[in-house]
Each structure stands twice: as structure tokens, then as C-alpha cells.
């Protein structure tokens, strides 16, 4: 509702999803038809469950492995854990929750970049940070290296930003020249297992500190300070 700046979901849909999750957890098995229905319900409810997208993609990925007309298949352990995560969130879900968007919420802006063979950098107003890759981090993919400083920043400064906002939910706008991560973070989804783990950690931090992390793509030539920091040239 744009007039009240709130998101409202039907309690009927929430209760139906909880019943479906409970049924799956009791039986430990699912058919494609049942699981497809649940995926659709959770996609609808995700708009009201803050920072929940990273816990949704595995369901759609698993759905693609199910076939029509086949016997119900046993649910893998990681999916059972995700079902319990959704069950817990839906049990405490308010029918109406406030919007979090840059137009009406507190905002902080940072700029980040990563150098594949050196390190990464973050520019936050008058504060600048840089990190030299460890031997193991050097083996990571480019999207992983671009995503890591964002998660590290929220882990380190999330509580400070939350206090600055007086406990209100707000938006952390991250300006990055990574198109891949602009999509991944905003969608809460990545096909890379390493990046998916970082997105889950980021989602957990967003819920803890009341931050909605929104990536805004920035051309490389407009991201000079973060680029120089990532190369330890500044």
C-alpha cells in the first residue's frame, strides 16, 4: 500500500504455506505438484519476509529435479533445514509490515570494488577501507571477490549504522561496477555455491541490523576511489 508505506499479505496464504511445510516435514517426501505449489506460495510471501530471497532459490533449483508422475522423493537435509527456516519466519510474520525503500527510509551509501590479484576496497564518506586477499581468497571467483567486501562491511558496521538510524529499518545503497553482483544481491540469488553462502550471511546480517542492501551499478570510470583502494594505490 503506497499510501501507508506498508506491505500486506493474506493470512490465508501464510496459513496454507505453513500447513504445506508442516506436511512436508512430517512426511519427509514430496511430489513435483506439491512442491511447485509451495514454491509459488513462498515467492508470494517473500515480499513480506525481510531478506528471505537467498532461502528461496534452493527450492526452485530442487523443483527442476522433480518429474511429473514420479513417486514422491525424499527431501535432502539442506532443504529440510530451509523448510524449517521458512516455518519459523512465517509463524511470526505480521500481516502488515513497513516498506523499506530509499524514498522514505534512512539511507547510507558506500562504493566498493575488488582487484582480482590484490585486494578489495570500500569508500564510505570520509572513511576508506581496504583488504589484502589471503592465499585462499585469491582462488575465489571475481563475483565472490566483489561480494566479499560488501558482506564484510555490513558485518563490521551494521550495528553502527543501525544505531545511527535509531533502530529504524533503512537502505544501504552499494555502488558497484559488478553487473553480476548487482543482479545477485538484488535478487538474493546466485548459481555459485560460494556466493550463495555469502548471500545467506548477508541476509542474516540484514535482518539483524534492519538494513536492506541495494546494489546500484556504477560504471568503472565512476568508481575510481574504491578501485584505487582495492589495488592498494590509495
Residue positions per predicted region:
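C-terminal reverse transcriptase regions that engage the nucleic-acid substrate
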Residues: 1-99
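Mobile genetic element proteins and their domesticated derivatives, centered on retroelements
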Residues: 17, 39-40, 59, 113, ...
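Short secondary-structure boundary/capping segments
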Residues: 53, 187-195, 229-234
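A short acidic-Thr-Gly-centered motif at the start of a beta-strand
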Residues: 95-105, 164-166
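Two-metal-ion RNase H-like nuclease active-site motif
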Residues: 105-117
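RNase H catalytic domain
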Residues: 154-224
Amino acid at each position: 500500500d503506497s499510501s501507508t508505506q506498508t506491505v500486506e499479505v493474506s493470512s490465508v496464504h501464510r496459513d496454507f504455506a505453513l500447513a504445506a511445510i508442516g506436511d512436508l516435514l512430517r512426511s519427509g517426501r514430496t511430489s513435483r505438484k506439491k512442491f511447485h505449489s509451495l514454491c509459488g506460495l513462498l515467492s508470494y510471501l517473500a515480499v513480506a519476509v525481510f531478506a528471505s530471497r537467498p532461502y528461496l532459490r534452493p527450492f526452485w533449483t530442487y523443483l527442476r529435479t522433480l518429474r511429473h508422475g514420479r513417486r514422491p522423493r525424499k527431501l535432502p537435509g539442506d532443504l529440510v533445514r530451509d523448510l524449517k527456516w521458512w516455518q519459523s519466519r512465517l509463524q511470526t510474520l505480521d500481516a502488515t509490515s513497513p516498506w523499506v525503500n530509499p524514498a522514505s527510509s534512512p539511507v547510507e551509501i558506500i562504493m566498493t570494488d575488488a582487484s582480482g590479484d590484490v585486494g578489495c576496497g570500500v569508500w564510505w564518506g570520509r572513511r576508506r577501507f581496504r583488504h589484502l586477499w589471503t592465499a585462499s581468497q585469491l582462488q575465489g571467483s571475481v563475483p565472490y571477490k566483489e561480494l566479499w567486501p560488501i558482506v564484510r562491511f555490513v558485518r563490521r558496521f551494521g550495528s553502527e549504522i543501525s544505531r545511527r538510524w535509531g533502530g529504524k529499518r533503512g537502505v544501504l545503497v552499494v555502488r558497484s561496477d559488478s553487473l553480476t553482483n548487482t543482479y545477485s544481491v538484488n535478487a538474493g540469488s546466485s548459481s555459485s555455491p560460494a556466493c550463495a553462502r555469502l548471500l545467506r550471511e548477508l541476509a542474516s546480517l540484514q535482518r539483524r541490523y534492519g538494513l536492506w542492501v541495494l546494489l546500484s551499478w556504477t560504471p568503472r570510470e565512476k568508481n575510481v576511489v574504491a578501485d584505487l583502494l582495492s589495488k592498494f594505490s590509495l
